[in-house]
Regions:
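Extended, hydrophobic alpha-helical segments
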Residues: 1-45
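Intrinsically disordered, low-complexity boundary segments flanking structured domains
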Residues: 23-24, 50-55, 80-82
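Short, intrinsically disordered low-complexity segments
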Residues: 36-63, 69-70
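C-terminal structural segments of small proteins and small subunits
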Residues: 57-96
């Protein structure tokens, strides 16, 4: 199953829910900036992550965005940092 790279960003109205979302995201990707993670996920991992987040967020007040950057193996997927850079996820298999 092909792994795809996603930028996942979120806007959570409650600080308590924000912390819950942050903890969930820590298990699925690399923290890039406040409320922004870079995640390499296959379809099963993405659906699982979406399900976990759906249980925590308030759908009327909060927002989570998954931006699909394409297959991890593609050379065309580039992430460029200005200023302090962050470590990108390892494109290999993830073991949880």
């Amino acid at each position: 199953m092909a792994r795809r790279r996603f930028v996942v960003c979120y806007d959570i109205a409650s600080p308590a829910r924000w912390r819950q979302v942050y903890r969930i995201m820590q298990g699925h990707g690399e923290w890039i900036q406040l409320s922004v993670f870079l995640c390499d996920l296959d379809d099963v991992e993405r659906i699982r992550l979406e399900s976990l987040l759906a249980e925590v967020i308030h759908h009327r007040d909060d927002s989570v965005c998954f931006a699909d950057l394409g297959q991890v193996e593609r050379d065309a997927v580039k992430v460029v940092f200005m200023g302090k850079s962050r470590r990108l996820p390892n494109p290999g298999p993830a073991i949880f």
